[in-house]
């Protein structure tokens, strides 16, 4: 991998990780259109350490409170009813599905799931689901001619069942094209949460899974000796900087804007990929590395 490739791929990772458009799909597509080798699941996992570092810094006050309360709840029974302590447990519970499936489906994630036809299908299907979820949220928030506005759930209302729903949605993002934030936010909206609450828990929920995946891939990459460490680290730093900027923008955006622009973008991109593959302009396995 060249330094230019790492710059572009790092930017793509940072700019798309927190938007409901699938960063893994965009990394895969960028490489395919540029004629580069598929950066692979390992590169994606390692550079995601950079974007999760951005989450740690942006939500540092929330995370510090949650960690402190969670540890205190281990020795103080009264603390177990504290919202921040419960949030710590709910992040752990919500991380179980992706942990189990990530290990079980590792070979599929690094192989068959990276077919561009699957990526395109997931972009469209999950785009439609996000659109439905967004419409339901908007209807509850504004009401209608014959119905009053409905109060939506906030993070204080999160429970184990809902945490597992979020977690199951996050696990779906192991397939390129799904989008971690898109799937979890869609799931949260469908079970009644506000846009901001769904997004906030989505970002917090990703921390354990992404960091664990990144460390796991780092270990394997170091053992294989086939990683261009300089460009990979550079891409991770670029992903961190651009990712932080996107989080700050996105949290403001969702406070009063619809997700529909992302929905139409996903659908249009998915259709374009299918058309390019169908006409032979793009191979479904384009840019895959020999390994």
Swiss-Prot record:
InterPro entries assigned to the protein according to its UniProt record, in alphabetical order: UppP (IPR003824)
GO cellular component terms listed in the entry, alphabetical order: plasma membrane
Known EC number: 3.6.1.27
Subcellular location: Cell membrane
Protein's GO biological process: cell wall organization; peptidoglycan biosynthetic process; regulation of cell shape; response to antibiotic
Gene Ontology MF terms in the entry: undecaprenyl-diphosphatase activity
Protein name per the record: Undecaprenyl-diphosphatase 2
Organism: Streptomyces avermitilis (strain ATCC 31267 / DSM 46492 / JCM 5070 / NBRC 14893 / NCIMB 12804 / NRRL 8165 / MA-4680)
Upper lineage: Bacteria, Bacillati, Actinomycetota, Actinomycetes, Kitasatosporales
Gene (name only): uppP2
């Amino acid at each position: 991998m060249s330094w230019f490739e790492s710059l572009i791929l790092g930017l793509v990772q940072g700019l798309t990780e927190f938007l409901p458009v699938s960063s893994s799909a965009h990394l895969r597509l960028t490489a395919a259109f540029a004629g580069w080798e598929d950066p692979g699941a390992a590169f994606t996992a390692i550079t995601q350490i950079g974007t999760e570092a951005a989450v740690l810094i942006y939500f540092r006050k929330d995370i510090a409170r949650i960690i402190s309360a969670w540890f205190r709840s281990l020795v103080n029974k009264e603390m177990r009813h504290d919202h921040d302590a419960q949030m710590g447990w709910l992040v752990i519970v919500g991380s179980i599905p992706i942990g189990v499936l990530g290990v079980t489906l590792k070979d599929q994630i690094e192989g068959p799931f990276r077919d561009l036809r699957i990526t395109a299908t997931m972009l469209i299907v999950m785009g439609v689901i996000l659109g439905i979820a967004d419409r339901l949220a908007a209807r509850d928030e504004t009401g209608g001619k014959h119905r009053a506005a409905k109060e939506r759930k906030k993070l204080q209302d999160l429970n184990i069942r809902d945490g597992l729903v979020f977690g199951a949605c996050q696990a779906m993002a192991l397939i390129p094209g799904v989008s971690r934030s898109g799937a979890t936010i869609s799931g949260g909206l469908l079970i009644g949460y506000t846009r901001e609450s769904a997004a906030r828990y989505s970002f917090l929920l990703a921390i354990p899974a992404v960091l664990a995946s990144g460390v796991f891939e780092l270990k394997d990459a170091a053992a294989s000796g086939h990683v261009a460490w300089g460009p990979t680290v550079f891409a991770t730093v670029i992903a961190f900087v651009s990712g932080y900027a996107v989080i700050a923008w996105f949290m403001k955006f969702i406070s009063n804007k619809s997700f529909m622009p992302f929905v139409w973008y996903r659908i249009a991109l998915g259709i374009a990929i299918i058309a390019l593959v169908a006409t032979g302009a793009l191979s479904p396995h384009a840019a895959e590395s020999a390994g």
